[in-house]
Swiss-Prot record:
Keyword Metal-binding applies: yes
Pathway annotation: Secondary metabolite biosynthesis; terpenoid biosynthesis
EC number: 5.5.1.13
Residue span of region Disordered: 52-80
Record-level GO BP terms: defense response; gibberellin biosynthetic process; gibberellin metabolic process
Physiological role: Catalyzes the conversion of geranylgeranyl diphosphate to the phytoalexin precursor ent-copalyl diphosphate.
SUPFAM superfamilies: Terpenoid cyclases/Protein prenyltransferases, Terpenoid synthases
Description of what induces expression: By UV irradiation.
Protein name as catalogued: Ent-copalyl diphosphate synthase 2, chloroplastic
Location of the protein in the cell: Plastid, Chloroplast
Gene symbol of the encoding locus: CPS2
Lineage: Eukaryota, Viridiplantae, Streptophyta, Embryophyta, Tracheophyta
Transit peptide (residue range): 1-47
Pfam family, one: Terpene_synth
Catalysis: reaction(s): (2E,6E,10E)-geranylgeranyl diphosphate = ent-copalyl diphosphate
Natural source organism: Oryza sativa subsp. japonica (Rice)
Length: 800
């Protein structure tokens, strides 16, 4: 099933650009379009000065278009936001830098603050007074207008009631703020019945354990609540059932997530439990559980932990603290998926270095060095660290597997959608040396996610995010190897909820470093700039295509657009236009020449024509170019122009050599099966256009690492081109088993791109190989209709 967002091109404003000329060309990739009958072009005689003059005029026209053309739709707000992008980037940088020493940027929990407020003064000599009067003050300052406490931006009845009950109990315990206490109590009385209608998919963590304990405290204080309400009877029953399932010995034997809700339990052996404190002094990073333990034990480290928390949060405390690992990893993930991570390379590297130091062989926790690890944070760390070149073993997932099933936390009562989603994403970054565990993890997570999608149940127990179902569907429909950066970003711009997303702990909370409106504004402005530039480049490319009469060689306008899209979807940075356009023009011209050579292959004359083209390209034989073969002549002129546009000096010779090698792959026997050679031509062109190849060409020729990258890319793309042809009506010979073979080679390619310790080849050049291979994977994976939907979405549909 394709995602709804990937609509057919015919429904979008630029549909005329995307309509196929005929059914058959739709079934071909930009690599292997079959030729239509060739219409002989007229004689095209240009000298180099004319070509350069034409290009100068083209560029002037581009400049005129850019200044004259308003943003698509004439949206002044969009224009304003794009002009403000540098300021937004600086603001985000400042926020990321300010958080570098933070233990987590999260909102305060009224519930946890209430438990802190309940702590009696430890050195009071028997006199009752609050140990943390700042917590009382925070409660008094943060009551909502309707009398409740909780998340002001989203109403979930469990969140509002447990926060409100906790605050009312705290105020009543110390006999302060009577008016606010009365308003809170009235809110509880008016809304208690709603518990019977609450959605259990979004239950607050440990609610059935902790809410009854607060009710008991309220009853002892004589607060007027209907303790026999039917909704409460159900919660009491769930509490008894859950407590009966918790072996007392297991609770005290090792650190588990049960430590997070200790305030809801009784008859505890504190001497044994205090062994499981986190390095920061807390019990499982829970202020509420730590406050309860402090009341019972007077432990100095618990006291210091709570003092640190309320000092950092102006008298309050979050529901979980610290969350430094989670905060850093998820913010990096969001910036990457929003397509703006390139602006924050140093900040991201610092965050990932921090995460790497906190990753243990058993995995990672959400905060500090908490002994209880979880698969969610482990998966995010594994994926991001591997993609940034860190040496991370796949054995970190072994801790979360039992009898072929995977869990987020040991002893969990239900599976988390987002934990399996993030684990599925991580399981696709596989190296050849990894054991079968990652493949097993991928299969398990995919089966789980597919089952949830089939039943329409794509909500999660830890986050409320409207875009989550779409995120999961995209991950299932487009594996990492076939997901292009600009496609993923364009879709994610509509999935990312920014500040509207809420996380679920013992109450709702927000992660301001993860879900940030400024991220979204900056990403939209950045993408709008990309679209503006892409539309101008597309107009220029179309003029080039028409001027060189490439339509006469069977190249349709649609295939030109697809070639540009594949280049722009991978290489999208504004300062890399030469690489992007070099890729696109090379793909288009390769298709035109391939179409011409196929005409000769039909009568066994491809070898001779190939030799003549190579001779004309290498020798600048202008007499030969004026021969009667006008089709070949026009292609040589176009090729000459391409080289002049994208290469200078020695780089020009390198680009001619790249084309020569590509032409040499054409023989009567090959019948145009040159997908691997075309991939290498694209890689070489991109590197030459970037200026990287010329400066390192000699060393690369002697590099075994570079040679192996070429071998892998050529092999993979040759297989994928064969698959594309078979899907589109070509021969089915040698197609069986291609996917498995490509997957094996992809493992080695991923390792050579992200896990190599060799310095022979730059990381950017390695990424070029991967970009080109992924573009082949994308074409092989997607239907023509899906590709055209992506073209419309990425290039022509404005970001709202």
């Amino acid at each position: 099933m394709q995602m709804q967002v990937l609509t057919a091109a015919s429904s979008l404003p630029r549909a005329t650009l995307l309509r196929p000329a005929a059914a058959e060309p739709w079934r071909q990739s930009f690599l292997q379009l079959q030729a239509r009958p060739i219409q002989r072009p007229g004689i095209m005689l240009h000298c180099k000065a004319q070509l350069q003059g034409q290009e100068t005029r083209e560029r002037r026209q581009l400049d005129d278009d850019e200044h004259a053309r308003p943003p698509q739709g004439g949206d002044d707000d969009v224009a304003a936001s794009t002009s403000e992008l540098p300021y937004m980037i600086e603001s985000i940088k400042s926020k990321l830098r300010a958080a570098r020493n933070s233990l987590g940027e999260t909102t305060v929990s009224a519930y946890d603050t209430a438990w802190i407020a309940l702590v009696n003064r430890l050195d009071g000599g028997g006199e009752r007074s609050p140990q943390f009067p700042e917590a009382i003050d925070w409660i008094a300052r943060n009551q909502l207008p309707d009398g409740s406490w909780g998340d002001a931006g989203m109403f979930i009845v469990q969140d509002r009631l447990i926060n409100t009950l906790g605050c009312v109990v705290a105020l009543a315990t110390w006999g302060v703020h009577e008016e606010q206490r009365a308003r809170g109590l009235a809110y509880i009385q008016d809304n208690l019945w709603r518990l019977g209608e609450d959605d259990e998919e979004w239950m607050m963590v440990g609610f059935e354990i902790t809410f009854p304990v607060l009710l008991e405290k309220a009853k002892n204080l004589g607060l007027d609540i209907n303790y026999d309400d039917p909704a409460l009877q159900d919660i009491y029953a769930k509490r008894q059932l859950k407590l009966a399932k918790i072996p007392r010995e297991a609770l005290h034997a090792r650190p588990t997530t049960l430590l997070h809700s200790l305030e809801g339990m009784e008859n505890l052996d504190w001497e044994r439990l205090l062994q499981f404190k986190c390095p920061a002094g807390s019990l499982h990073s829970s202020p509420a559980a730590s406050a309860y333990a402090l009341s019972e034990t007077g432990d100095k480290e618990l006291l210091e932990y709570l003092e640190t928390a309320i000092n950092n949060f102006d008298g309050g405390a979050p529901c979980t603290y610290p969350v430094d690992n989670f905060d850093r990893l998820w913010s990096v993930d969001r910036l990457r998926r929003l397509g703006i991570s390139r602006y924050f390379t140093s900040e991201i590297e610092e965050y990932l270095e921090y995460a790497y130091r906190h990753l243990s062989p058993d995995g990672m926790s959400y905060g500090g060095l908490c002994p209880v690890k979880d698969i969610d944070d482990t998966a995010m760390a594994f994926r991001l660290l591997r993609l940034h070149g860190y040496n991370v073993s796949s054995s970190v997932f072994n801790h979360f597997e039992k009898d072929g099933e995977y869990f987020c936390f040991a002893g969990q009562s239900s599976q988390s959608l987002t934990a399996m989603y993030n684990s599925y994403r991580a399981s696709q970054i596989v190296f050849p040396g990894d054991d079968d565990g990652l493949e097993q993890l991928r299969a398990y997570c995919r089966a789980f996610l597919e089952e949830r999608r089939a039943t329409g149940n794509l909500m999660d127990k830890w986050v409320i995010a409207n875009g989550l179902p779409s995120e999961v569907e995209y991950a299932l429909d487009f594996p990492w190897k076939a997901s292009l950066p600009r496609v993923e970003t364009r879709v994610y711009l509509e999935q990312y909820g920014a500040s509207e997303d809420a996380w679920i702990g013992k109450g709702l909370y927000r992660m301001t470093l993860v879900n940030n409106d400024l991220y979204l504004e900056a990403a939209k402005a950045d993408f709008t700039n990309f679209q503006r530039l892409s539309r101008l480049e597309w107009l220029s490319l179309k003029r080039w295509y028409i001027r060189n009469n490439l339509q006469a060689h069977g190249v349709t306008e649609q295939s030109v657009l697809r070639a540009y899209f594949l280049a722009a979807a991978n290489i999208f940075e504004p300062n890399r236009a030469a690489e992007r356009l070099g890729w696109a023009r090379t793909a288009i011209l390769a298709e035109a020449i391939a179409s011409h050579l196929r005409q000769y292959s039909a009568n066994g004359a491809a070898d001779g024509m190939t030799e003549r083209l190579i001779s004309g390209l290498a020798s600048h034989d202008w007499d030969w170019r004026e021969s009667k073969d006008s089709a070949a002549r026009s292609l040589l002129y176009a090729l000459d122009e391409l080289i002049d546009l994208h290469a200078f000096g020695n780089a020009s010779d390198s680009l001619r050599e790249a084309w020569k090698q590509w032409l040499m792959s054409w023989t009567n026997e090959s019948q145009g099966s040159t997908g691997g050679d075309t991939a290498l031509l694209l890689v070489r062109t991109i590197e030459i256009c970037s200026g990287r190849h010329g400066s390192a060409e000699q060393s690369l020729k002697n590099s075994a690492d570079y040679a192996r990258l070429e071998q892998i890319a050529s092999s993979m793309c040759s297989k994928l081109a064969t698959k594309i042809l078979a899907q589109n009506g070509g021969s089915m010979d040698n197609v069986e088993g291609i996917d498995q073979e490509v997957d094996v080679e992809m493992k080695e390619l991923i390792q050579r791109v992200y896990g190599s310790s060799s310095n022979d080849v730059s990381s950017v050049t390695r990424q070029t190989f991967l970009d080109v291979v992924k573009s082949f994977c994308y074409v092989a994976h997607c239907s023509p209709e899906t590709i055209d939907g992506h073209i419309s979405k990425v290039l022509f549909e404005d970001v709202n």
